[in-house]
């Protein structure tokens, strides 16, 4: 009784605390930890009790930036995507380890029709005479890679199932280069289409806008801010890469990106297209419209 508002910072347990307190109809707000930390730095003593008192003062005065906590379903989607990303990373490290070990003994992996596994089996069968003891090591690493692939198949099946049941995801997949993973990543990062009044704000939220520094006569533009979800930012960059480098059909967006590539190089063009994709995907979701290849790109 008498409880007016509860304030907490973003952190590892913030989602669980938020959901549990919401179930109890508690008047809770989740604050941006960076903003709260700036205020707490003014406290003379750093203790848990002092931090709690400082947070209470921040909530009382209203001097905080409220953070939107995503829904349970969005976090489940992101858990699947993050787990898949970890397994893909482990697979790449295993492949690089196998290549590196074989190169030490003069065996060049190269590329073969049929993929990595077939080439590794060829090497195990007939190219390790100079170091027979390496067969067991390579087989162990290859078996681990095969196990990872089996787990990835299960996660990919779940991702495809989630994509089929989501109307916004199917809508976003009408954009060339945007697959189920990228679309799910964007939808789960935004969570609520009404969260952003302007579609252009999504690019800033995902850390794809350029840093700006102005002071007196100094004015310069830096690299992208890289705030927000690194995973979704990476997915958008990969989608931009596919759009620009694969033959996925002509569109004004692709032509725009290629013009930037001619002037500034492909790396900057991919970042620019990823930034534009973030805006376009939100606008499509908001308007419930499929991608228009001849849509204006401003």
Feature map (PLM): residue ranges:
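Glycine/alanine-rich phosphate-binding loops at beta-alpha junctions
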Residues: 1-29, 38-39
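Short alpha-helix plus adjacent loop in nuclease-associated cores
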Residues: 22, 28-79, 86, 116, ...
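Short, amphipathic alpha-helical segments that act as regulatory/interfacial helices
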Residues: 56-60, 81-84, 88-91, 95, ...
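Short helix-capping/linker segments at secondary-structure and domain boundaries
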Residues: 62-65, 94-95, 152, 191-195, ...
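Glycine-rich, often acidic, oxyanion-interacting loops/wings at catalytic, nucleic-acid
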Residues: 80-171
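Phosphate-backbone recognition surface of nucleic-acid-processing proteins
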Residues: 171-174, 180, 184-266, 298
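Basic, amphipathic alpha-helical segments enriched in Lys/Arg and hydrophobic/aromatic residues
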Residues: 258-298
């Amino acid at each position: 009784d008498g409880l007016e508002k509860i304030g907490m910072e973003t952190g590892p347990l913030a989602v669980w605390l938020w959901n549990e307190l919401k179930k109890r109809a508690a008047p809770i707000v989740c604050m941006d930890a960076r903003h709260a930390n700036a205020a707490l730095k003014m406290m003379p003593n750093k203790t848990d009790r002092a931090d709690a008192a400082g947070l209470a003062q921040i909530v009382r005065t209203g001097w905080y930036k409220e953070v939107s906590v995503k829904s349970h379903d969005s976090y489940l989607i992101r858990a699947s995507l993050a787990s898949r990303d970890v397994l893909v990373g482990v697979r790449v490290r295993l492949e690089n380890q196998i290549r590196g070990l074989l190169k030490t003994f003069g065996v060049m992996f190269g590329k073969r029709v049929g993929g990595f596994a077939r080439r590794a089996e060829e090497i195990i069968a007939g190219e390790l005479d100079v170091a027979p003891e390496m067969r067991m090591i390579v087989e162990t690493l290859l078996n681990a890679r095969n196990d990872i692939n089996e787990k990835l198949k299960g996660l990919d099946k779940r991702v495809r199932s989630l994509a089929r049941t989501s109307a916004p995801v199917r809508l976003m997949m009408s954009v060339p280069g945007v697959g189920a993973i990228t679309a799910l990543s964007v939808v789960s990062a935004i969570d609520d289409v009404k969260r952003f009044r302007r579609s252009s704000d999504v690019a800033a939220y995902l850390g794809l806008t350029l840093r700006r520094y102005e002071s007196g006569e100094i004015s310069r533009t830096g690299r992208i801010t890289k705030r927000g979800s690194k995973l979704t930012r990476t997915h958008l960059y990969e989608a931009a890469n596919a759009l620009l480098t694969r033959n996925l059909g002509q569109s004004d967006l692709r032509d725009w990106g290629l013009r930037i590539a001619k002037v500034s190089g492909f790396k900057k063009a991919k970042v620019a297209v990823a930034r534009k994709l973030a805006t376009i995907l939100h606008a499509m979701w908001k308007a419930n419209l499929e991608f228009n290849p001849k849509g204006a790109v401003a």
